[in-house]
Amino acid sequence: MDAIKKKMQAMKIEKDNALDRADAAEEKVRQITEKLERVEEELRDTQKKMTQTGDDLDKAQEDLSAATSKLEEKEKTVQEAEAEVASLNRRMTLLEEELERAEERLKIATEKLEEATHNVDESERVRKVMENRSLQDEERANTVEAQLKEAQLLAEEADRKYDEVARKLAMVEADLERAEERAEAGENKIVELEEELRVVGNNLKSLEVSEEKALQREDSYEEQIRTVSSRLKEAETRAEFAERSVQKLQKEVDRLEDELVHEKERYKTISEELDSTFQELSGY
């Protein structure tokens, strides 16, 4: 009987222990269930976050693609601006060379103008000399005429001096003839000089017209250079603006890349937490 009682007591103790173990097991199951529910809730939240992260990643990739397209467009704009600047530089070089040639032609025209002016001055001097000579010849002719009259008076007054007067008269007539010839030659020379002066004047007018045209072309070249300089400045401004835009886009791309790396790290961390939770559940 004692053995039965002891056995019953032992069984009761074992029953109590079993009940305690059962309660403990139920509590542990409840805790595990709650933890599992929390894990499932966290898993659902994580899945939502992953979905949102995927959407954000897609959006980031779309933004990156758009930024890349904009960057390519800006690079194309900068290349076009640089090409335009190079073209303008070549054109400006050609204009400078043409301006140098125009200045050289203007210099030659100026030298010719100075030479023509010198020739006109020389012609004027020669003309004045010939006029003075003509006046001298006329004065000599007047003197000869006076001498002739005096000789005629002397001839009328004194026949005995007729031969001497006749000889003097012949000499005077010869001098008069030579004077008339010189006067005629002087007049012809004056006509020639006047014609030469007219030709020189026409050449001078032609040179003045050429100089005026050269000045007009020079003004046109200067205006073209100012226009090219203005366009060059605008192109430089456009290039600087494009460069600043490229820098801003590059910063935006760098920021998106950093965000992408950060999201990948978050995804990796969440995956590691899920793996750890599943391992803990498997251990129970």
From Swiss-Prot:
<comment type="function">
    <text>Tropomyosin, in association with the troponin complex, plays a central role in the calcium dependent regulation of muscle contraction. Involved in muscle actin filament organization and muscle arm extension and morphology. Protects actin filaments from depolymerization by unc-60 in vitro. Also has a role in male mating behavior by regulating the copulatory spicules. Binds to F-actin.</text>
</comment>
<dbReference type="GO" id="GO:0040011">
    <property type="term" value="P:locomotion"/>
</dbReference>
<protein>
    <recommendedName>
        <fullName>Tropomyosin isoforms a/b/d/f</fullName>
    </recommendedName>
</protein>
<dbReference type="GO" id="GO:0005884">
    <property type="term" value="C:actin filament"/>
</dbReference>
<keyword id="KW-0175">Coiled coil</keyword>
<dbReference type="GO" id="GO:0005865">
    <property type="term" value="C:striated muscle thin filament"/>
</dbReference>
<dbReference type="GO" id="GO:0030835">
    <property type="term" value="P:negative regulation of actin filament depolymerization"/>
</dbReference>
<dbReference type="GO" id="GO:0006936">
    <property type="term" value="P:muscle contraction"/>
</dbReference>
<dbReference type="GO" id="GO:0005737">
    <property type="term" value="C:cytoplasm"/>
</dbReference>
<feature type="coiled-coil region">
    <location>
        <begin position="1"/>
        <end position="284"/>
    </location>
</feature>
<dbReference type="GO" id="GO:0007015">
    <property type="term" value="P:actin filament organization"/>
</dbReference>
<keyword id="KW-0514">Muscle protein</keyword>
<dbReference type="GO" id="GO:0031674">
    <property type="term" value="C:I band"/>
</dbReference>
<keyword id="KW-0009">Actin-binding</keyword>
<dbReference type="Pfam" id="PF00261">
    <property type="entry name" value="Tropomyosin"/>
</dbReference>
<dbReference type="GO" id="GO:0006937">
    <property type="term" value="P:regulation of muscle contraction"/>
</dbReference>
<dbReference type="GO" id="GO:0030833">
    <property type="term" value="P:regulation of actin filament polymerization"/>
</dbReference>
<dbReference type="InterPro" id="IPR000533">
    <property type="entry name" value="Tropomyosin"/>
</dbReference>
<dbReference type="GO" id="GO:0034609">
    <property type="term" value="P:spicule insertion"/>
</dbReference>
<keyword id="KW-0963">Cytoplasm</keyword>
<comment type="similarity">
    <text>Belongs to the tropomyosin family.</text>
</comment>
<dbReference type="GO" id="GO:0051015">
    <property type="term" value="F:actin filament binding"/>
</dbReference>
<feature type="region of interest" description="Disordered">
    <location>
        <begin position="40"/>
        <end position="78"/>
    </location>
</feature>
